[in-house]
From Swiss-Prot:
Residues 86-111, 281-309, 1097-1157, 1179-1207 are annotated as: Disordered. The chain crosses the membrane at residues 1832-1852. The keyword Membrane applies. Residues 1118-1157 have a biased composition (Polar residues). It is found in: Membrane. Belongs to the GREB1 family. One of its GO terms (cellular component) is membrane. This is GREB1-like protein. The lineage of its organism: Eukaryota, Metazoa, Chordata, Craniata, Vertebrata. The gene is Greb1l.
Length: 1913
């Protein structure tokens, strides 16, 4: 209700304090209020406060801590709530003592008409922080802006104005009871009750409104003026609530605190030193709270150390002060700290967390943990008083490494100690599953006793070198090895034999024995009562230690207690070790803020004053002034001159160097490794599409678009833009015109800054608006700033916090089906955790670097491993160096300035070193001995190299200074020294900050332009690569290097500031990644020769040719940690410092500038690449028909020539060498560790600060593991921390499955290896694959029944283009069906069939139904397409036209009479406006009269004459109805024939097609109806056109009588020709070529005397087409699927409109029997696509009346039944049931015909499939028809199907039947069945029984068909 213990009492009246204490006692249910006397008398507030000295708030502590600490070190329980915002509501409820549900709170209803929307007040005004963060809000004096949380809007904070008297105030006074607040939305004031206020702002609470529950945060403005979430408001409930989250341990838990005295006597509001972090127990494995109290050790958390400045206005905010416990209170409130000075009275103490459940069987008393925390009273032996001025007196801030057991309470000067949880998890051995134990080689996890662990710890500390610090990962492996040895020993013992344990009594002397070999660097202190004794003794000795006495580095304090067992901890006293451990506990952001604070508050003033004098004791500024005066106005000559040559500034500015065109500077080449990786990416995308998960449909897309998101670095943005422009990818993808691509490129590269949201929304709009474009979102350097949006509120002004998460993981991105996410990283470890969103199978790793050498690359990658290996090369000047002299200087300075961060000290020293080196090399040789040889060597090379030639080219030095403030200081200082020495025209100093563009002086820009031959006046360098050849120092700042590529002239990389603060793998390796590059092969193959090459080369170059523009690099420079040469004389050359050499002029045309090559990301390496290799960029995809898919080479002709020129030069003349890296000692010991082999390497460190190890027991990560293996290792053993963007991606609690984003890939490769070029190439080949390399499955089946065919004696000679009508008409018709789709159909009887042995036929024919064979083919430019194809050329076929265009079509009825149907038929045409020219309309009323037809004599090369009809059903999406490409874009008349009910769908998908809509009566009809109506309509139209044209004087026979009827699955057409036979006796091959439908039709339409042919067609393609099958160029046989039909000749031959199957075979047989010609062109073939939906599909046959939901399969024999029976009636067309029944009933209907092909079934006027075991003899009843010769044939059956009047009794009497032959008569109804029997006199020869009458199983409403069977007598 208003009490607060978040402050201390300053000078309050007794009554007020008493009142508040009484109220707190009454209201407190979970913890003890602060005693009244401690409020009054223990107030330590002695320090005046200055608001000007407030330090900006450091980032919140690591989220894995159980208690976050406040700025003074006391436990601030409220922070756990802040970090688990999503759990607020749960936490509230967990305070309840019972498990009963909370009583719901009933709110007063809102006033009528008021707004009730969450996030808005009742007046309808927005209160959400996201909406108001930029608003200027006026609040009355005395009010503060605070944030309220609504349970309905967990992600939002509501802004309120509250009177600060009712909040816990800044001065520690208790908040007044009650409430006073204003609504900042509508401005309403004077809310006196929080209940009333909560109603007004629509909090909609389910519990009683309390300000303590719902007012959560102070709101503060950032430096940018943005209102954002500030610190928590510390209500008492927030603190006590923590109890529920602490129930991991079964013992009471106390806290650690460090009350801190102001440093240096200042009172600036900053808590000096470091906070003591919390220790023994992490939170649960995922960083959250545990819901049940478990004694199982939790997964290790991760800890960080944070100096905690305050947001509030006093030093002591949030500090608890309590006196001794009183009996009436239930317990001592945990976390009570002490005053800042040690108190004489028994002071309240700070205590670390007690140890968790013992892991080993040591006798430890157990205390049950209840719902409230009840730590026991402090015992005298369990407290440690930290001595005053410990840090000041000793120069050491001790670090206490928590070991095993209960740490004591600390009080007094606790700011001078640090408690570190570094090794604590090593001692908490987790329970592992059996499979994990087996993997680790362990029998159990209970192998090590506490005594073993103590001895292992001591041995480890003894083994550490003087410059090393303990590493958790290293010690974990030691513990694991020990456990494995114990396991081996345990297995070796006989069964049941005990392993003798170490007794507690043996421990002290064994421990001392182990430490005795450490040369007094490790001490052991053994006590009997508690650890407090040992720690107190250690601190006392430290405070009394004299400066000349040697301190041990480590003191191991052991408590050998008989009651509690052995406990221990380690006190680190080593000057280097303690500082390094303390600093390594800070995250990068935290230590940068710490440095910033030290600079802002003037804490560095002592250090700065120290460096105001030179090493010789002179005043530096005065000395520089004196040198400037001595030099006067002149400056050192810019180039081509010595350092002592001076010119005027005007002359220096006007000096123009010789032009040195770098030919391939602007060209972009893709090298073989990049192409290989791009293809891997492409194949992975294909794998996603093929996975069956339906997450990606590549056939849907015809275009590729992209966006590249990069971290917040201006240089990186410009660098990526350059790559995009140079690669030409925008033009290649068709995204931009070539003229505009350069300026439009900026749309495609976006940086993660505050403006990204709007840009990204534009991109996502494009994604939604273009469903047929596949978008690729490339997230480059994706490991940077991968923090979650939810934790963004804790970042306090971090500009990029959560932005990547907001973009990459937003719902729209995850759900967009046309968006691929490609995350690219050199250090992907933070993306490879247990919570990763990327499937491990979707990772694409760079190719093994040794394979690059095998591929014959001229340049090889030189990365981190190569740098480490180079230490073993034995060369005099290693590439990886540690400046020992510098490290000694640093060490001395750090002892003098123990309170400053070591990076500050290092940076000041580095500035001095470079300044003095400049002075020593120019004017003060006496300073030479005071610069380290390393620094002197670098500066000498830098300033002398431009003077050696007329080009003025030189080297680049990169100095890495992570702190922006320090970097600016370094730049200003070095620039000042340079200018005063007159070197401002000699070399440039550039600040490389991520936030700003490069700034280069005008005269240097002019020089760069000259070298480039760049005549663009406005050009300025925008990337580091643009600085190629410029002598310069780049001071690279920013938290992380962000993947910027440096030029080939980079020669030195100074990383001496990168030290113990960089103890994660990513942090350390990405720093060295700056220098990685491509080098000449010789450097890796023969390093000693290669690296000493340049010195020998120098001897050969004549002095007269010193004006060459080429530079050679010499690495023979002294370095301080191996064979350093410290010069003593003033001569530079004597000192061996400078030996840069030059190359002769004649070679310069052939040579590219030497030095290393930066292939990353894809630009202009001078690698020998023969241009032809990569011209075909899809050469891995070489389809048989893709000859047309060649692409232009990516590199320009100039670069190809240049690359070839390089390959012709003599090898070894110039060698591209890697830069030299100078490291700090800490980094060198980790990165150079391969040399010794014993030390840990960087790869064993925690992979990234945002992840945590899952278990302390895990196998080691080996250096030789492949990238893929490392990924699997990290995915198993690391988890995301709470602030990580992937933290929310937790496994499903039930299934354990993780949510993976199926369309997300990860490309990983070493830094600067060429990943950008690779993914740009990937975009290009992805596009090509979508457009040109689409594959299609076509049927690939050989013809059937080829052995039944009549061998025609008559045949035309090969090579004839058209059939000769005379010859062709004499050829017999081959009645056998050869189309493989009719494999299971009845054979058509011929004389040839009668002669074939039945056994062969039987054996051949009996086969199981099987899947039809298909083959994958490449679509060519002449393919027919479905709706999923879209391109610029065929826009008129685009699907989903807006509704406005649907009305562009008109509906026309067309009526004609049909003799077959016996009635008028009305069809509907839907004709788009654009197609109306094909039709004739009446002048009045626009009535459709006819469809225009051409003349036979027309000759138009850009048209085909025949209208194309395509019947289609069920394939509105998948039917191949887009004939634009197949017709080569020419005008043609194409009509879709669709059923009435499907018309809306087809109209939607094909709005620009002419539709012919069948009458509704044919909705359930088969394909026969469509073909029948097409033919009927066409004939009627032909007559209309003849009449119309006859009036115009055209003869009737001159009108074109043909139509094309084509299936909707015809995809490709081919032409075949027989190749010439060689002399060899092998069969001649055939050549095939893909052709267009247009050319096929035009060829067939040009057939001489074409009007005499009834049907023309082509054969079906199969892969085994041989010259034998093409022997006859034309066949007289069946044609299917694609026919030219002469509707005039076939006027009297009709399709059977009832048919569902075999309608074309039936029609062909009718046509042939009428004496008409059917011609098949064998030199053309048709490919049919395997379309899996729609078309000639079976009906699902089910009962008409469904009795139950379960559908029982209905067998074909149930499709018929006896008339009037109780049979289940079916819902299917009668004709369909009949045809399906006949296919399966041949055994019952025609038993004599089974496999009896000599005696076929006689079918009059019809062909029906009656099963593959039966042959059918087709006979026409028409007079003068040509039929097969039936003489001597005895038929086994007779089939009469709907026979007409031409069938008479006389006809039937001509045929002979076997005895027992069967008859089947089929009619429309029962009466016509009886009439037919009588009319045909069938009863004379056939016997009928009443039970032999059947009907199809339809109801009478559905008009069943009837049939009667009988037997021949």
């Amino acid at each position: 209700m208003g009490n607060s213990y978040a402050g201390q009492l300053k000078s309050a009246r007794f009554e007020e304090a008493l009142h508040n204490s009484i109220e707190a006692s009454l209201r407190c249910s979970t913890a003890v209020p602060r005693p009244i006397f401690s409020q009054l008398y223990l107030d330590p507030d002695q320090h005046p406060f200055s608001t000007a000295d407030v330090k900006p708030k450091v980032e919140d502590l690591d989220k894995d801590l159980v208690h976050p600490y406040t700025q003074n070190g006391s436990v601030d329980f409220s922070h756990n709530v802040a970090m688990n915002e999503m759990e607020d509501d749960e936490d509230e409820e967990e305070m309840s003592d019972s498990n009963s549900p909370p009583i719901p709170y009933s709110q007063k209803p809102a006033p009528e008409g008021s707004c009730t929307t969450d996030g808005f007040c009742q007046a309808g005004k927005d209160l959400r922080l996201v909406s108001l963060c930029m608003e200027q809000i006026d609040i009355p004096a005395g009010f503060l802006l605070v944030g309220a949380k609504s349970p309905n809007l967990p992600e939002h904070i509501l802004v309120c104005a509250v009177d600060k008297r009712f909040l816990p105030d800044d001065h520690g006074k208790n908040a007044l009871l009650g409430f006073s607040g204003n609504c900042i939305g509508c401005g309403e004031r004077g809310f006196r009750y929080f209940t009333e206020f909560s109603n007004h702002i629509n909090l909609k609470l389910t519990t009683q409104p309390k300000k303590q529950k719902h007012l959560k945060y102070y709101l503060v403005r950032t430096s940018q003026g943005v209102l954002s979430k500030g610190p928590l408001i510390c209500w008492k409930e927030c603190r006590s609530r923590q109890s529920s989250a602490l129930c991991h341990s079964t013992k009471p838990i106390s806290s650690v605190s460090s009350a801190v005295a102001p440093e240096n006597g200042t009172a600036n509001g900053y808590k000096a030193g470091f906070t003591v972090t919390e220790a023994a127990n992490g939170t649960s494995g995922h960083g959250g709270k545990s819901s049940s109290c478990s004694s199982t050790p939790s997964r290790p958390g991760n800890y960080s150390l944070s100096p905690r400045p305050t947001f509030t206005s006093v030093d002591q905010a949030n500090m608890f002060i309590s006196g001794p416990p009183k009996k009436r209170h239930r317990g001592w409130y945990p976390g009570s700290p002490v005053s800042q000075s040690a108190l004489v009275v028994p002071a309240p103490t700070v205590r670390p967390l007690s140890r968790t459940e013992p892991l080993l069987s040591t006798p430890v008393p157990q205390t049950p943990l209840t719902g409230i925390l009840q730590p026991r009273p402090v015992l005298a032996g369990e407290t440690v008083i930290v001595p005053e001025n410990l840090l000041s007196n000793s120069g050491v801030r001790p670090v206490i490494l928590i070991g095993y057991g209960t740490l004591p309470y600390f009080y007094g000067n606790v700011g001078d100690i640090v408690v570190s949880p570094l090794l604590v998890n090593c001692y908490k051995i987790p329970q592992l599953e059996n499979k994990d134990l087996e993997q680790l080689g362990l029998t159990s996890t209970h192998l090590l006793s506490v005594e073993n662990m103590i001895l292992l710890t001591i041995q480890y500390l003894v083994r550490l070198g003087p410059d090393q610090i303990p590493l958790r990962e290293e010690f974990e492996q030691i513990m694991l090895t020990a456990m494995q040895e114990f396991s081996v020993r345990e297995r070796a013992l006989p069964l049941g034999a005990p392993c003798a344990p170490m007794s507690p009594a043996q421990l002290p002397w064994l421990a001392r024995l182990a430490a005795s070999v450490s040369q007094d660097l490790v001490h052991v202190i053994v006590t009997q009562n508690s650890l407090a004794e040992g720690i107190s003794e250690t601190l006392r000795l430290l405070s009394e230690m004299k400066h000349y006495q040697r301190l041990p580095d480590y003191v191991v304090a052991i408590c050998a207690s008989k009651i509690r067992g052995n406990e221990f901890c380690v006190v680190v006293l080593g000057q280097h070790q303690s500082r390094a451990l303390a600093e390594s506990m800070l995250t990068t952001s935290e230590f940068l803020k710490e440095i910033s604070y030290e600079l802002i508050t003037g804490k560095v003033s002592f250090l700065a004053s120290h460096f105001k004098t030179t090493s010789l004791g002179d005043d530096l500024d005065k000395l520089l002034e004196k040198m400037q005066q001595r030099r006067g106005d002149s400056v050192v000559t810019p180039f081509n001159g010595d350092l002592d040559e001076c010119v005027s500034p005007q002359e220096a500015a006007a000096m123009i160097p010789t032009q040195n065109l770098d030919v391939d500077n602007e060209t972009f080449q893709i090298y073989q490794p990049q192409l290989t990786v791009a293809r891997r990416l492409l194949s992975q995308v294909c794998a996603i599409a093929d996975s069956g998960s339906q997450s990606l449909d590549l056939g849907h897309f015809s275009k590729v678009d992209f966006i590249i998101i990069v971290p917040r670095s201006e240089v990186l943005v410009q660098q990526t833009l350059q790559r995009v422009r140079q690669s030409g990818v925008l033009v290649d993808l068709g995204l931009e015109e070539s003229g505009l691509a350069h300026q439009r490129a900026e749309r495609y590269v976006v940086r993660l800054d505050n403006e990204i949201q709007s840009k990204f929304e534009v991109f996502m709009r494009r994604v939604k608006q273009n469903p047929y474009t596949l978008f690729v979102l490339v997230h480059d350097n994706s490991h940077v700033e991968l923090t979650s949006v939810i934790s963004g509120s804790l970042s306090h002004g971090e500009p990029t916090h959560g932005l990547a998460d907001r973009v990459i993981n937003c719902r729209e991105v995850l759900e967009a089906f046309n968006l691929l996410v490609l995350q690219v990283s050199s250090f992907p470890y933070t993306l490879q955790t247990q919570q990763s969103r990327i499937s491990s199978s979707n990772e694409v790793h760079w190719i093994q670097l040794d394979t690059m050498e095998d591929a014959g690359c001229e340049k090889l990658y030189f990365g981190l491993d190569e740098y480490s290996k180079s230490l073993q090369w034995g060369i005099t000047s290693p590439l990886l160096r540690c400046d020992e002299t510098f490290e000694k200087m640093v060490s001395t300075l750090l002892e003098r300035y123990p309170r400053l961060h070591s990076m500050v000290v290092r940076c000041y020293l580095l500035i001095q070193q470079y300044s003095e080196a400049l002075m020593a090399l120019t004017t003060m040789a006496s300073l030479r001995d005071h610069s380290t040889p390393e620094t002197l060597s670098i500066m000498d090379d830098l300033i002398t190299s431009p003077g050696k030639n007329k080009s003025g080219k030189g080297h680049m030095l990169v100095i890495r200074v992570p702190s922006v403030q320090l970097a600016m200081l370094a730049k200003e200082r070095l620039q000042e020294v340079r200018d005063k020495l007159g070197l401002q025209y000699r070399f440039e100093i550039i600040l490389g900050s991520p936030a700003s563009e490069l700034t280069v002086e005008t005269h240097f820009v002019t020089r760069l332009k000259t070298w480039r031959g760049n005549d663009q006046d406005e050009w300025i360098p925008r990337t580091y690569q643009d600085l190629e050849g410029l002598p310069c120092i780049v001071i690279l700042t920013g938290k992380d290097p962000l993947g910027e590529t440096f030029p080939r002239s980079l020669k030195y990389c100074d990383l001496r500031l990168i030290d113990s603060s960089y103890l994660t793998r990513t942090a350390l390796e990405q720093e060295v990644g700056l220098a990685c590059c491509y080098v000449s092969k010789e450097v890796i193959r023969g390093p000693a020769a290669a690296l000493d090459l340049s010195a020998k080369e120098a001897e050969r170059v004549p002095a007269s040719e010193n004006d060459s523009e080429e530079l050679l690099i010499d690495l023979e420079r002294p370095q301080s940690n191996s064979s350093a040469v410290t010069g003593t004389s003033g001569s530079i050359m004597e000192n061996g410092v400078s030996s840069s050499s030059t190359a002769g002029k004649p070679q310069q045309q052939l040579l590219t500038p030497t030095s290393s090559i930066r292939l990353d990301e894809g630009v202009s390496a001078s690698t020998a690449v023969v241009g032809e290799i990569l011209k075909q960029e899809c050469d891995s995809l070489d389809p048989p028909m893709a000859s047309s898919t060649t692409s232009k080479p990516s590199s320009s002709s100039s670069s190809s020539a240049q690359a070839l020129a390089w390959s012709r030069q003599p090898r070894g003349l110039h060698t591209a060498l890697p830069p030299v890296i100078i490291l700090s000692k800490a980094a060198y010991s980790l990165l150079g560790s391969q040399k010794g082999g014993r030390l840990p390497s960087s790869s064993s460190l925690l992979p990234h600060a945002d992840v945590a190890w899952v278990s302390s027991l895990r196998p080691g990560l080996h250096k030789d593991m492949s990238s893929e293996e490392q990924s699997l290792y990290y995915r198993q053993w690391t988890s995301a921390r709470q602030h990580h963007a992937d933290y929310s991606n937790q496994p499903d609690p039930i299934s354990g499955a993780r949510t993976l984003h199926p369309r997300r890939l990860l490309l990983t490769g070493p830094p600067q290896v060429g990943k950008t070029g690779s993914y740009l190439q990937f975009l290009r080949i992805l596009f090509r694959m979508l457009i040109r390399l689409l594959e299609v499955d076509v049927y690939n089946e050989e013809e059937i029944n080829t052995d039944h065919s009549d061998d025609s004696e008559l045949s035309q000679s090969e090579g004839e283009p058209w059939p000769d009508i005379e010859t062709f008409s004499k050829m017999p018709f081959d009645v056998s069906v050869h189309d493989p789709k009719y494999r299971l159909m009845s054979l058509v009887y011929s004389e040839k069939l009668a002669g074939i042995k039945q056994e062969v036929i039987k054996e051949y024919k009996v086969e199981e139904p099987r899947q039809r064979e298909t083959m994958s083919m490449m679509l060519t430019q002449y393919a027919a397409y479905n709706t999923f194809h879209h391109c610029e050329q065929c826009q008129q076929y685009m699907a989903f036209t807006p509704a406005s265009q649907m009305s562009d079509s008109t509906l026309h009825a067309f009526t004609f009479s049909s003799s077959m149907l016996g009635e008028e038929v009305q069809l509907y045409f839907i004709i788009p406006k654009s197609k109306e020219s094909h039709f004739v309309f009446s002048k009045q009323g626009r009535h459709l009269e006819s469809m225009r037809l051409p003349l036979v004599s027309d000759k138009n090369l850009n048209a085909v004459k025949s209208p194309i009809f395509t019947p289609s059903s069920g394939r509105h999406e998948h039917g191949l109805l887009n004939l634009f490409h197949a017709m080569e874009g020419i005008s043609h008349l194409h009509l879709l024939v669709v059923k009435e009910y499907e018309m809306p769908l087809y109209r939607k998908y094909w709005p620009n097609h002419i539709m012919l809509v069948l009458p509704g009566m044919f909705n359930n009809a088969g394909v026969g109806a469509a073909r029948f109506l097409i033919k009927e309509l066409s004939y009627h139209n032909l007559e209309l056109e003849r009449n119309r044209l006859e009036e115009l004087g055209v003869k009737r026979q001159c009108v074109w009588p043909f139509i094309v009827v084509m299936d909707d699955s015809c995809v490709l057409w081919n032409i075949h020709s027989v190749q010439e036979q060689t002399s060899q006796p092998t069969e001649a091959g055939i050549s095939s070529k893909n052709v267009s439908l247009k050319s096929v039709l035009q060829h067939i339409e040009a057939t001489p005397k074409i009007i005499h042919y009834a049907i023309l067609g082509i054969q079906k393609w199969n892969s085994k087409l041989t010259s034998q099958s093409l022997k006859a160029p034309f066949s007289r046989c069946h044609v299917h699927d694609f026919i030219l039909l002469n509707i005039d000749l076939t006027q009297n031959v009709q399709y059977d409109f009832n048919r569902y199957f075999c309608e074309d075979v039936d029609f062909n047989l009718r046509t042939n029997s009428s004496g008409l010609l059917i011609c098949r062109f064998n030199n053309f073939s048709l490919m049919k696509k395997h379309v899996q939906v729609g078309g000639q599909r079976d009906f699902i046959i089910k009962p008409k009346l469904m009795v139950s939901e379960n559908v029982v399969p209905i067998l074909p024999l149930q499709y018929v039944c006896a008339p009037d029976s109780e049979h289940t009636l079916l819902a299917a067309p009668a004709q369909f049931l009949l045809e399906k029944f006949l296919q399966h009933a041949s055994y019952k209907l025609f038993p004599k015909a089974i496999h009896n092909f000599k005696s076929p079934v006689l079918a009059i006027d019809c062909y029906l499939n009656i099963g593959q075991e039966v042959a059918i003899c087709y006979v026409s009843s028409r007079p003068h028809s040509s039929n097969v010769n039936c003489e001597g044939v005895f038929f086994s059956g007779l089939l009469l199907y709907l026979c007409d009047s031409f069938v008479g009794a006389d006809l039937l009497k001509k045929f002979k039947f076997l005895k027992g032959a069967t008859l089947c008569v089929i009619c429309q109804d029962r009466s016509s069945l009886r009439q037919t029997i009588v009319r045909l006199e069938l009863e004379d020869e056939w016997q009928f029984r009443l039970r032999d009458e059947f009907q199809t199983a339809n109801s009478s409403d559905d008009k069943p068909l009837y049939f009667l069977t009988g037997r021949h007598v």
